[in-house]
Amino acid sequence: MSGRDGGERTPLLEAHSLTTSDCAAGAPDPSRCLKTEASQVMAETGEGYFEAVALPPPQLPEEESAPSTAPSDPGCAGTFQIRAGGDGGYVVPEARLEPAPPPTESLETASVSLATDDSLGNGCQPGEPQGLSREKPLETCGAEKLGSDLMAEAKAEEVKTEEGPVFSVAVDEEVVGKEGAKEEEGVEQGMEVEERPVGEEIEMVENRVVEEAGHRPLRMDLRMNPLEAIQLELDSVNAQADRAFQQLEHKFGRMRRHYLERRNYIIQNIPGFWVTAFRNHPQLSPMIRGQDAEMLRYITNLEVKELRHPRTGCKFKFFFRRNPYFRNKLIVKEYEVRASGRVVSLSTPIIWRRGHEPQSFIRRNQEVVCNFFTWFSDHSLPESDRIAEIIKEDLWPNPLQYYLLREGVRRARRRPIREPVEIPRPFGFQSG
């Protein structure tokens, strides 16, 4: 390369790397020249990250005298320029920053890129041999640093893009491997099923039927549990009702006792009251025959009392005055309900006078009819329970209605009753 006035010019380099400086004749560092050649080879083969761009033809002498600060081509606004001469040298445009296709992964490429990075790092260090370009502007150093940053970002993006497909390929291989294993297991199971004899299949079906049958009671239990809970709640409510009923019964029983005592006192002064009521009752009259009617004339009072609990039983008390038939003044007939639900009847034995024992049964149309006084001593006849129920539920609550029938109606009208008469109520509220 000669001066500005004469001589032929040496041809410029066809391509310059973005990250290297020119190897001029005055540059004493041969290693840097080798690095520059390596970067040029990389640009020519397309293995680098940036493509080399051909330089424009040399300018005419008139154009050479123009200052180096002339504006460049707007199309080349993104290119970097390096001053080639000293005071009056021309500007050499360098390669544009354009992304290149991803390089092939090899040791040579890695070494070239490392050498290029070293040259970039050394390009802006102070005290390096400067050759032709002794005064490198700050813009060139900034451009070189920017190029190195862009190269690092490009490398990171390539690593990310390379990791994604590799990972997806690995996942696809795992999925394919699992599907293949499942298909092999299904084939093996099918072979095992085919190899099983018919007897084993029948046993398996029977076992399934037994298991399903064993689960059915559990479902019934699930249905029975709410029903049992409801029944327990109902039992508790019934128990509360029983307790409340007992309390009310004791309360109103004391109030009724006063009226019952007054009623009994009046009945005792009416001769033949109870025998008239018994004989006028439509269900009790068939049992009163001959001698029974004569003995009932001596009844002075009748009391019906329930036991401590209304549902545990009741007690009948018959009061007699002195008579020629038996010696008892009080005969008691009691019915008691045991815990098992069985009803047991007890009675006071009658002490008969000699020659006045009543007939136990009266035969009518080949049917055995219970005698009224036999009801006290015989506890096996079903009609004895019927007599107790009639006396308790019908006769005792309101004996006056049966006394006033037939002949007693006229007498009741002539002599009005001054004492208050109790309104008929269920037997449960008539305890004394």
Curated annotation (Swiss-Prot):
Start and end residues of each stretch annotated as Disordered: 1-31, 54-110, 116-135
Covalent link Glycyl lysine isopeptide (Lys-Gly) (interchain with G-Cter in SUMO2), residues: 160
Short name of one Pfam family: NAP
Gene3D superfamilies, alphabetized: 1.20.5.1500, Nucleosome assembly protein
Cell compartment(s), UniProt: Nucleus, Nucleolus
Example of a GO cellular component annotation carried by this entry: chromatin
One GO-annotated biological process of the protein: nucleosome assembly
Keyword terms: Isopeptide bond, Nucleus, Ubl conjugation
Superkingdom, taxonomy of origin: Eukaryota
Description of post-translational modifications: Ubiquitinated by the CRL2(APPBP2) complex, which recognizes the Arg-Xaa-Xaa-Gly sequence at the C-terminus, leading to its degradation.
MF terms in GO: chromatin binding; enzyme binding; histone binding
Family matches, as PANTHER family: TESTIS-SPECIFIC Y-ENCODED PROTEIN (PTHR11875)
Family of the protein in this entry: Belongs to the nucleosome assembly protein (NAP) family.
Official protein name in the record: Testis-specific Y-encoded-like protein 1
Gene: TSPYL1
